[in-house]
Amino acid sequence: MCEYSKALHILLKSPVTDDIIKFLTDTTLRVVPSSNYPTPPGSPGEKHLTRLPSLMTFITRLVRYTNVYTPTLLTAACYLNKLKRILPRDATGLPSTIHRIFLACLILSAKFHNDSSPLNKHWARYTDGLFTLEDINLMERQLLQLLNWDLRVNTEDLILDLQPLLEPIKQDLARSSDQRKRINMMMSMNRRTCAGTSPIRSNNRFKLYEKQRNVSIASDLSSATLVDSCNDLRRLKDVTNIANNTVANTNYVRTVEKWNDNVNRQSWDLEQIMSQHGF
């Protein structure tokens, strides 16, 4: 029932289509079967019958002239079905009876379900002279009496009486629902797949960043190797300092020895000079 309610809501919001007019024509024809129409006389009424339009043409003109809303037309279909259940199966009428029945149902639907509706004189004009104002007033009173002045129509009545129009919409809704379910299922599977792979990629990216942050760009040495290298540099510096000090001491010793040699040489020269001069 929920699916039919959705379909009914869509149908009531839709414009009047040829399918709706055909549905109304078929519904009206089932109220009084055409086999029950009397044989038309061959005298003055013949002129009247020659200009009687087909029921579908008659309904199409009324829809075009009045710009009637879809809910008003569909409610008239409910009145037609109520009238069908009330009338005896062997009910007879004139060839224009089906036109009168539909027009009376449409007038009552427009007056009962709309705040404003055309007057009966306007309805007489919409029939292109097929019916007079007196005809309109008479058929309206007769229909009210047949329906016992009960013009109420509920959702269940509409769903029951409009099945031929609701079924295609219901099937379209079911197909659309299945398509949405398949799309949602595919999107859910894609999200699950992405959720299953994204954390691994993210963790690998962070691990790579941490690895690059802790390792020197210009060297592949490990931390232990770097520490050993620093110690070797310190030892090399100490050895260099010692060597420098040794060289400095050696130079100092050489300078002292050279000075001593000079002193000794000078002392030797002085003695020689003194001996030469008899000192």
UniProtKB/Swiss-Prot annotation:
Annotated consequence of substituting residue 33 to N: Stabilizes PCL1
Modified residues (Phosphoserine): 43
Chain positions covered by the region annotation Required for degradation by DMA1: 29-36
GO biological process, alphabetically ordered: cell division; G1/S transition of mitotic cell cycle; long-chain fatty acid metabolic process; positive regulation of macroautophagy; regulation of cell cycle; regulation of cell division; regulation of establishment or maintenance of cell polarity; septin ring organization
UniProt-recorded Gene Ontology molecular function terms: cyclin-dependent protein serine/threonine kinase regulator activity; protein kinase binding
Statement: the UniProt record of this protein carries the keyword Ribosomal protein: no
GO CC term, one of those recorded: cytoplasm
Domain Cyclin N-terminal residues, every copy: 19-152
Record Gene3D superfamilies: Cyclin-like
Pfam families referenced in this protein's UniProt entry, alphabetically: Cyclin_N
Induction statement: By transcription factor SBF (SWI4-SWI6 cell-cycle box binding factor) in a cell cycle-regulated manner. Peaks in G1 phase.
PTMs per UniProt: Phosphorylated by PHO85; necessary for interaction with DMA1 and subsequent degradation. Ubiquitinated by E3 ubiquitin ligase DMA1 in response to nutrient condition; this targets PCL1 for destruction.
UniProt entry keywords in alphabetical sequence: Cell cycle, Cell division, Cyclin, Cytoplasm, Isopeptide bond, Nucleus, Phosphoprotein, Ubl conjugation
Location in chain, cross-link Glycyl lysine isopeptide (Lys-Gly) (interchain with G-Cter in ubiquitin): 82, 121
Result for mutant: residue 39 to A: In pcl1-2A; stabilizes PCL1
InterPro entries noted in UniProt: Cyclin-like_dom, Cyclin-like_sf, Cyclin_N, Cyclin_PHO80-like, PHO85_cyclin_1/2/9
Record's subcellular location: Cytoplasm; Nucleus
Residues bearing PTM Phosphothreonine: 39
Similarity comment: Belongs to the cyclin family. PCL1,2 subfamily.
Subunit note: Forms a cyclin-CDK complex with PHO85. Interacts with HMS1, NCP1 and NPA3. Interacts with DMA1.
Note: Present with 606 molecules/cell in log phase SD medium.
Function: G1/S-specific cyclin partner of the cyclin-dependent kinase (CDK) PHO85. Essential for the control of the cell cycle at the G1/S (start) transition. The PCL1-PHO85 cyclin-CDK holoenzyme is involved in phosphorylation of the CDK inhibitor (CKI) SIC1, which is required for its ubiquitination and degradation, releasing repression of b-type cyclins and promoting exit from mitosis. Together with cyclin PCL2, positively controls degradation of sphingoid long chain base kinase LCB4. PCL1-PHO85 phosphorylates LCB4, which is required for its ubiquitination and degradation.
Listed name of the protein: PHO85 cyclin-1
Gene from which the chain derives: PCL1
